[in-house]
């Protein structure tokens, strides 16, 4: 009997299992599976999980809900898992934290899986690695899924085919078939109406427009239609606000948002206003596209216009009142101290004599 191998020898061998076999030691017993305590309550579904977050992610497949929403302005994409959202946010930030450590490469990637694919294709086996093993073929492919799709030509096996009546479309992978299935099933609105969206984005758009839930600022009670707008507004109440100073020489203007600073530089310093209102008779120009979109509401009768606080027109004061220095209280109409008109003066000599006196007696 050969002596038992050390741990170092076992690790350095091809597999730990081979080392145990050579040492006449049986393989380690499998780890006991954790009990599935979290069971799906939907009818005709027997899925169960050992962790609550796994069940939550599974339930989203039934409800169509995507609870993790990107709060970047103008985005609004939603995801089932929190790490999917974290991965998506890298698109906005441009961050690529995963770097290839191969000599002379240093290529960066936003996800670990993309880095792994890069290493497999470019460094471990830069040649096409998936070869068809059917007799007389030997075609090679870079991706395993491409090989599987190709082999269907040899076996005449149907690809992943849609079973919906009247469709018959087929796909190269089950994930693509599942994604296609939503075209027939759709995304049902969960707000009590019968709307069914063909895509998740379409459902989100419907929810924003048909089921607007305004959110309120807890400080000033101002209301907003979107949470990201409220989040941006809350910065105005922060004790220490970020201030963005104009970098142009001789300009001391400051702004609380990058958007306003960019708009200032483009319109004031560079005199660039490329976005023109195309409404007939308007022709106003703007430095930023968002500013043009905000302005377009003025021309759209179907949209709610901004409720501006309009000051009531100031009453015209008589010459006598202005000369007297008398200031009438706000909200009250001042007494009529106007001078008589020319026709009255000509017809009444008494009025002509009293007119200069009126200027001196009003207090």
UniProtKB/Swiss-Prot annotation:
Region described as Disordered: spans on this chain: 301-363
Residue ranges with Low complexity bias: 338-350
UniProt-annotated location(s): Nucleus
Protein name: Transcription factor IIIA
One BP annotation, GO: ribosomal large subunit biogenesis
Top-level lineage group: Eukaryota
InterPro entries: TFIIIA_Zfn-C2H2, Zinc_finger_trans_reg, Znf_C2H2_sf, Znf_C2H2_type
Keyword Nucleus: yes
Zn finger limits (C2H2-type): 38-62, 68-92, 98-123, 130-154, 160-184, 187-211, 215-237, 244-269, 275-299
Pfam families, alphabetized: TFIIIA_zf-C2H2, zf-C2H2
Taxonomy of the source species: Eukaryota, Metazoa, Chordata, Craniata, Vertebrata
Function according to Swiss-Prot or TrEMBL: Involved in ribosomal large subunit biogenesis. Binds the approximately 50 base pairs internal control region (ICR) of 5S ribosomal RNA genes. It is required for their RNA polymerase III-dependent transcription and may also maintain the transcription of other genes. Also binds the transcribed 5S RNA's.
Native source species: Rattus norvegicus (Rat)
Gene Ontology cellular component list: nucleus
SMART domains in UniProt: ZnF_C2H2
Principal subcellular localisation of the protein: nucleus
Coiled-coil residue windows: none
Gene Ontology MF term list: 5S rRNA binding; DNA binding; RNA polymerase III general transcription initiation factor activity; zinc ion binding
SUPFAM superfamilies assigned: beta-beta-alpha zinc fingers (SSF57667)
Keywords on record: DNA-binding, Metal-binding, Nucleus, Repeat, Ribosome biogenesis, RNA-binding, Transcription, Transcription regulation, Zinc, Zinc-finger
